[in-house]
């Protein structure tokens, strides 16, 4: 029995895609039933002059409260690919905490992110192999892969330089967009005019400047995933963005209302939310 338990922890029985509830930030975990792991962003506290409801007065990082306990509870000890979509604090702020707790085989970043000297300095302190991703690169997952669609040029490491990943996993197409906004969406559509995605991780936490009408009309998603902090000061997701989803009958799941969003399955996905 002990041996069976060890096999189950190392090689989970189901495939998984989880949008972890990290407050106002992003962190998405993928694991195949073979044990392959990809983590897209790690979240991180955004510092404001006035505390928001979702912020704690302690110095505990968001990762220590949510992401790290979640991964440990799932029996994760190694992350094959840690993709840092861009350099905003709410996506990479808890990098050091995550690196202390898990073996990271490779950190993947955009070329533009490496133009930020402060970010490069942090990467050097972690001492993990760093690989730059460009459009066309692929990361293996679930007998398929996550394909890098964007960026296609060296940017500035900001929102519209976010790494965008697309994967057809268990028959469903997922698009993970980082903090991509309208300008980046337009470039993506120009490069991939027939791109469709059944599940869209909404860019920039559902901000007004992301998930444009043209983008949604081309992708034609049936489900939008929004990662945002409860009562966050930016008022993400924006009401206008939510209305754009509703007008197109796109179901919305959001971490600030629903908690973590998890897909699991062998050959077909089922989904659940966990607070």
Regions found by a protein language model. Name each.
Residues 1-275:
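Non-globular, low-confidence helical/coil segments that flank catalytic cores
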């Amino acid at each position: 029995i002990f041996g069976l338990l060890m096999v189950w922890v190392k090689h989970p029985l189901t495939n998984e895609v989880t949008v972890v509830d990290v407050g106002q930030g992003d962190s998405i975990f993928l694991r195949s039933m073979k044990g392959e792991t990809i983590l897209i962003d790690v979240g991180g506290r955004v510092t404001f002059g006035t505390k928001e409801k979702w912020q704690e007065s302690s110095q505990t990082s968001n990762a220590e409260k949510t992401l790290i306990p979640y991964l440990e509870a799932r029996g994760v000890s190694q992350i094959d690919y840690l993709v840092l979509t861009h350099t905003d604090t709410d996506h990479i702020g808890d990098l050091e905490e995550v690196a202390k707790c898990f073996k990271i085989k490779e950190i993947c970043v955009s070329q533009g992110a490496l133009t930020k000297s402060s970010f490069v300095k942090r990467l050097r302190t972690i001492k993990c192999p760093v690989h730059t991703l460009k459009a066309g690169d692929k990361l293996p997952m679930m007998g398929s892969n996550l394909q890098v669609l964007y960026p296609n040029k060296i940017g500035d490491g900001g929102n519209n330089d976010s790494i965008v990943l697309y994967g057809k996993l268990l028959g469903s197409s997922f698009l993970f967009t980082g903090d991509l906004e309208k300008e980046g969406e337009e470039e993506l559509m120009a490069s991939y005019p027939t791109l469709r995605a059944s599940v869209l991780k909404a860019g920039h936490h559902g901000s007004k400047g992301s998930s444009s009408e043209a983008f949604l009309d081309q992708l034609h998603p049936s489900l939008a995933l929004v990662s945002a902090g409860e009562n966050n000061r930016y008022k993400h997701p924006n009401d206008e963005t939510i209305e754009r989803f509703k007008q197109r009958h796109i179901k919305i799941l959001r971490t600030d209302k629903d908690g973590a969003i998890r897909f699991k399955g062998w050959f077909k996905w089922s989904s659940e939310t966990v607070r």
